[in-house]
């Protein structure tokens, strides 16, 4: 196979080589070894395409490992491949060791065939038992027949061996050529009319395939052209304003990419998602749907999704990574939706990506035959105006259909099944229907603190400039929080001179930042002798017509879900060449076929900003119309629609009705961004700027009053919708993402009075905001409102993107928090130390949950200080971090001086025996701790002895969790001695600790003298079934 042809991915080859044995014969594969490798075998059988699985079946059938009845059971349409693989393993295992060995051999043969097809033996074309010979030579016959099924069917039909109906069934477009060949052989097996003898003779006469068509010159030529095309499209990164062209290799900065974890799944606690490299996009375990082909990357607007895909394309085109794919086809969803004509898979790939100069039929057939070597990427699914549905099936790769039907069936796998697809989108655009067809989901969370610094250093090579910018960000937490999104880091880089020279303070809100970039563009478009030093009224007023033209175009585009504008659309919006020269409209990254030089806004957020600008200043927009903006969805479709009064969703009459219609048709996530910008523009901070541009100050006052009323009303309706608390319990509510955007809008307006009014309406004891894409900017907005609460609240922000910068933004509201939950938020020692420094003075705060972050021993001194100083502190949960014995020893010193702590969680750290000893010594006479977890901390018998001494002295501890350690019998015997003297412990968890019957016997003796303990967990230890029954009968408190 040529260089372009490549081979299976290195990971797959390595996994297969381990599973398939060290010798060709696999004679050492016993049933026990086979069963022990079951999960790996399932993964191997489903890791490729259905073609690979059916090849394994071919070999097993030819060797008579499978009977015909067995084989037919694996051809139920619609069954997931993983389900079929497990059934195959069950069937083979039940047939004994010989069958297990043959399955391993079949997998070897199928893998070898997929990489370098071998010529298999011949057969007697005049055999007296043709059906039996078709079966025994099945792999070779499928290989010989697969390119000639059409001709063979025609010939068999002419001679009366098959009916037209049977031909049509075999020719269904959902089948690959190899699958059609197999179905023809299957038909010959069950028909007794001479079809088997006919095939045996005529297949022998077919030409022998020398190699896969990947070797053909036309295929090699096309693959080379495709690589060149993709390389040209991805090698250079055009900045948002199109003013610079940078080498992607020089400027690309890794984002925080994490795999989405289903926290609802049963099983042991999961570690915090590791920050993944782009190269791990297709090799990450933990699939949502093993039978799906689509990888989803979600991220907020400006988080770097498009650049991530561009990097992927470049790595593939340069031969540096993703070489398991021979063909990569990149597409933009905002470009796809402009295609009005019906199109097929063939049209999409060839006419809208890369055209084969010769051999189109052969190349397309190659793509259909080897879909597992194909990758399609679809950028910006949130900008695709059609909502995903799986109602309309389309399975023909050659028949044309609408662009939305084509895309949706590609994502479902009805077209090009087993080809990988990567889709990027903002989270709000991903429906539950689409998630059914997602193999793996990733979160792109923007830059880390190190990423922001690295990006700025790559952008600025001038002496001292990058250092001054980084220092400015570190001193300005609000601006630093914005920069975790790459689009804001670009703005900071673009406006570095204005930021470093300004004296009025750094930007605080998103609106401030966009006005700064507006100032930058306006100043650069103004003659030097007339340019002012800032965004003054005269500068803005001078280009107001241009800004309103751009705003009208932006608003029309949002309402029509249009993000690429043709010359005719620009003309209709009165956008002139002079308006375009300002720089906010740039050439679209892809060209719509048949159009000339389409333009798009720098970024979707700029389109929302200009739409908000138009709504704030256009004389054609009556103030009352702004109420539509906060409807954020079509009536009845969105939770936001139910938050507002009916009057807010009624269309206005007359000249503003078209604007009302646009606002009602726009996508909710775009309306939310626009609403936040509008609130910022109408803030007191920017009142003077807008007043000078508005002919009627009264109209501007009415707009401002309307926005305030609408925000207050929306929040009040939201709070009133919260159901009352159960008697005796605190009111708890999980806020919806729409609530986050209302708070964001309030923060952009910077109205303390409104924030206090909103806080008065929030009468809850527990506010949950898990999985709400809360980043540093959202933290600043939450703190802006929550700091005015009259009653303490438990704030739960698990599974977000708070980070160290976000923690700093939350500090203003820490005084009203009685509990703070920050699970899975990529927080390090730096952020927690700042948090604790503030918490020392917050008497209300009694609980901290920090599991699944990046904490190390570096924060232990701060934790110890918190415990020693705050004698009303109740719970500290530090599970699944990176704390070792050194950190545990420091924390133990804080415990010695603490008299209030009731819950201490250390599971999933690395404290070991020394750490366990230090904690045990500190807790021996502790008067308040009721629950202690040291699960999964590499604790052995030495640590168990120290914990036993603690149990003998402690009179308060009620639950001790020690699962997933290495206590063994020696450690359990020590604990048993401690239990004999303990009078408070109710639950002892010892699962998965290599305990035998000897250790259990010691526990039973202790239980005879201890009436307090209610449960001892011993699951996952080394007991036989007989021992389990025996132990369970002796004491029901043993949970086995």
Swiss-Prot record:
Changing residue 1017 to G: Decreased ability to promote NF-kappa-B activation. It comes from Homo sapiens. The ATG16L1-binding motif mediates interaction with ATG16L1. Intramolecular interactions between the N-terminal moiety and the leucine-rich repeats (LRR) may be important for autoinhibition in the absence of activating signal. Changing residue 363 to F: In IBD1; uncertain significance; no disruption of NOD2-CARD9 interaction. Changing residue 1019 to G: Does not affect ability to promote NF-kappa-B activation. Changing residue 889 to P: Abolished pattern recognition receptor activity. Induction: Up-regulated by muramyl-dipeptide and lipopolysaccharide. The keyword Cell membrane applies. GO terms for cellular component: basolateral plasma membrane; cell surface; cytoplasm; cytoskeleton; cytosol; extrinsic component of plasma membrane; Golgi apparatus; mitochondrion. This is Nucleotide-binding oligomerization domain-containing protein 2. Changing residue 334 to Q: In BLAUS; somatic mosaicism in 4.9% to 11% of peripheral blood cells; hyperactive; constitutive NF-kappa-B activation in absence of muramyl dipeptide stimulation; abolishes interaction with LDOC1, ANKHD1, PPP2R3B, ENTR1 and TRIM41; decreases interaction with RIPK2 and PPP1R12C; no effect on interaction with CHMP5. Changing residue 432 to V: In IBD1; uncertain significance. Changing residue 684 to W: In IBD1; uncertain significance. Changing residue 992 to A: Does not affect response to muramyl dipeptide (MDP). It is linked to Blau syndrome: An autosomal dominant inflammatory disorder characterized by the formation of immune granulomas invading the skin, joints and eye. Other organs may be involved. Clinical manifestations are variable and include early-onset granulomatous arthritis, uveitis and skin rash. Blindness, joint destruction and visceral involvement have been reported in severe cases. Changing residue 492 to E: Abolished NF-kappa-B activation in response to muramyl dipeptide stimulation. Changing residue 140 to T: In IBD1; uncertain significance.
């Amino acid at each position: 196979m040529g260089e372009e042809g490549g081979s299976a991915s290195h990971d797959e080859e390595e996994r297969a080589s381990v599973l398939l044995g060290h010798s060709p014969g696999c004679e050492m594969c016993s049933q026990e070894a086979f069963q022990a490798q079951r999960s790996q075998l399932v993964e191997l059988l489903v890791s490729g395409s259905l073609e690979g699985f059916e090849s394994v079946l071919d070999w097993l059938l030819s060797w008579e490992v499978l009977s015909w009845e067995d084989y037919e059971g694996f051809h139920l349409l619609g069954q997931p491949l993983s389900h079929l693989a497990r059934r195959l393993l069950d069937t083979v295992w039940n047939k004994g060791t010989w069958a297990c060995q043959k399955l391993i051999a079949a997998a070897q043969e199928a893998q070898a065939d997929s990489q370098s097809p071998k010529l298999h033996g011949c057969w007697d074309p005049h055999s007296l038992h043709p059906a039996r010979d078709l079966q025994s030579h099945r792999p070779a016959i499928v290989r010989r027949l697969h390119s000639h099924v059409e001709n063979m069917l025609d010939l068999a039909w002419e001679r009366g061996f098959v009916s037209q109906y049977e031909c049509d069934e075999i020719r269904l477009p959902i089948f690959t050529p190899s699958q059609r060949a197999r179905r023809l052989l299957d038909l010959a097996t069950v028909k007794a009319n001479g079809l088997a003898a006919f095939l045996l003779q005529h297949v022998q006469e077919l030409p022998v395939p020398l190699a896969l068509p990947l070797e053909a010159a036309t295929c090699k030529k096309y693959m080379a052209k495709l690589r060149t095309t993709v390389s040209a499209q991805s090698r250079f990164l055009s900045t948002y304003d199109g003013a610079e062209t940078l080498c992607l290799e020089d400027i690309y900065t890794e984002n925080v990419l994490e795999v989405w974890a289903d926290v609802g799944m049963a099983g042991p606690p999961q570690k915090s998602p590791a920050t993944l490299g782009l190269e791990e996009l297709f090799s990450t375990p933990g699939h949502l749907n093993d039978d799906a082909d689509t990888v989803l990357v979600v991220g907020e607007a400006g988080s770097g999704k498009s650049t991530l895909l561009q990097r992927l394309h470049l790595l593939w085109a340069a031969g540096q990574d993703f070489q398991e794919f021979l063909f990569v086809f990149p597409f933009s969803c905002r470009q796809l939706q402009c295609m009005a004509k019906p199109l097929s898979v063939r049209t999409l790939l060839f006419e809208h990506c890369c055209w084969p100069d010769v051999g189109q039929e052969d190349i397309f057939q190659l793509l259909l035959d080897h879909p597992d070597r194909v990758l399609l990427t679809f950028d910006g699914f949130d900008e695709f105006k059609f909502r995903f549905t799986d109602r309309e099936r389309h399975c023909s790769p050659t028949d044309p259909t609408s662009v939305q039907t084509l895309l949706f069936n590609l994502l479902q796998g009805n077209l090009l099944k087993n080809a990988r697809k990567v889709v990027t989108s903002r989270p709000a655009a991903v429906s539950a229907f689409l998630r059914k067809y997602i193999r793996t989901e990733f979160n792109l969370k923007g830059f880390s603190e190190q990423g922001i610094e690295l990006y700025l250093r790559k952008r600025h090579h001038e002496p001292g400039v990058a250092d001054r910018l980084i220092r400015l960000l570190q001193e300005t937490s609000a601006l630093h929080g914005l920069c975790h999104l790459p689009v804001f880091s670009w703005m900071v880089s673009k406006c570095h001179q204005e930021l470093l020279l300004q004296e009025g303070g750094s930007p605080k809100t998103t609106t401030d930042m966009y006005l700064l970039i507006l100032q930058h563009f306006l100043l650069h478009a103004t003659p030097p002798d007339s340019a002012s030093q800032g965004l003054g009224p005269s500068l803005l007023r001078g280009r107001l017509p241009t800004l309103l033209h751009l705003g009208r175009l932006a608003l029309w585009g949002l309402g029509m879900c249009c993000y690429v504008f043709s010359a005719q659309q620009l003309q209709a919006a009165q956008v002139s060449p002079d308006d375009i020269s300002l720089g906010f409209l740039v050439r679209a990254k892809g060209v719509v076929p048949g159009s000339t030089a389409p333009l798009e806004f720098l970024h979707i957020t700029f389109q929302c900003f200009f739409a908000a600008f138009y709504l704030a200043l256009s004389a054609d927009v009556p103030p009352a119309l702004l109420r539509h903006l906060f409807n954020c969805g079509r009536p009845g479709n969105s939770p936001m629609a139910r938050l507002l009064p009916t009057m807010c969703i009624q269309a206005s009459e007359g000249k503003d009705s078209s604007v009302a219609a646009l606002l009602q048709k726009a996508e909710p996530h775009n309306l939310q961004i626009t609403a936040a910008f509008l609130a910022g523009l109408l803030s007191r901070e920017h009142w003077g700027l807008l007043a000078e541009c508005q002919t009627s100050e009264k109209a501007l006052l009415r707009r401002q009053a309307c926005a305030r009323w609408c925000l207050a009303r929306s929040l009040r309706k939201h709070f009133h919708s919260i159901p009352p608390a159960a008697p005796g319990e605190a009111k708890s509510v999980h806020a919806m993402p729409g609530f986050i955007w209302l708070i964001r809008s309030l923060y952009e307006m910077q109205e303390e009075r409104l924030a206090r009014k909103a806080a008065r309406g929030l009468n809850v004891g527990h506010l949950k905001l898990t999985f709400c894409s809360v980043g540093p900017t959202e933290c600043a907005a939450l703190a802006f409102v929550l700091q005015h609460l009259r009653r303490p609240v438990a704030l739960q922000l698990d599974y977000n993107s708070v980070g160290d910068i976000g923690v700093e933004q939350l500090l203003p509201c820490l005084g009203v928090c009685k509990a703070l939950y920050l699970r899975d938020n990529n927080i390090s020692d730096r952020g927690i130390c700042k948090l604790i420094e503030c918490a020392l003075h917050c008497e209300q705060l009694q609980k901290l949950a920090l599991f699944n972050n990046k904490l190390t021993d570096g924060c232990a001194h701060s934790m110890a200080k918190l415990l020693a100083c705050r004698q009303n502190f109740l719970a500290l949960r530090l599970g699944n971090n990176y704390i070792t014995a050194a950190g545990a020893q420091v924390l133990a010193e804080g415990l010695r001086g603490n008299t209030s702590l009731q819950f201490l969680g250390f599971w999933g750290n690395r404290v070991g025996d020394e750490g366990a000893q230090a904690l045990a010594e500190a807790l021996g006479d502790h008067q308040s701790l009721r629950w202690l977890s040291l699960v999964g901390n590499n604790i052995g018998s030495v640590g168990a002895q120290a914990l036993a001494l603690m149990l003998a002295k402690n009179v308060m501890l009620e639950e001790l969790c020690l699962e997933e350690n290495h206590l063994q019998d020696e450690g359990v015997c020590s604990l048993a001695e401690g239990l004999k003297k303990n009078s408070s412990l109710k639950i002892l968890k010892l699962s998965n600790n290599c305990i035998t019957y000897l250790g259990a016997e010691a526990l039973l003796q202790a239980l005879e003298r201890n009436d307090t303990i209610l449960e001892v967990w011993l699951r996952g230890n080394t007991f036989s079934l007989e021992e389990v029954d025996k132990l369970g009968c002796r004491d029901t408190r043993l949970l086995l």
